[in-house]
């Protein structure tokens, strides 16, 4: 078993690493840490079925918020990491959305698919394409995360639960947690 982790310690001088869980042996370390000292977030997953088919022993790809490229399982830079014009990069969350074996990228209320061979993305949902998760907002401004991502219906794809911008009810609740 292996472990992928993002480092937030500016003195470790590594943005993310991939290690053997039992021994701690490094399989790769991605780059030198940024001057700001905050990598903050990162992901690793099979996000491109075509890449996985041509690299069956190394199907996962990884990236973090401090570096500009996607890395394979031995730490080689492949292409530019996924980004969304005006919305930052997709370092937060992954979701099984379109029914294939690869995960899609989720940031705030935008869902995209990444293609490792070209370093490009295809947007499924987002503010600029008319297919928005209407009225949905992420939980916080900096991390832009949903409340829950899970396969609730058991159909392989995952559902996304987010707060709505304007919530109302005909029954007022006075108790708060």
Locate predicted features.
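Structural motif
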Residues: 11-17, 65-74, 109-117, 168-177
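Blade-level signature of beta-propeller repeat domains, shared across WD40, Kelch, NHL, RCC1
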Residues: 151-177
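Calcium-coordinating acidic loop motifs
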Residues: 22, 47-48, 97, 151-153
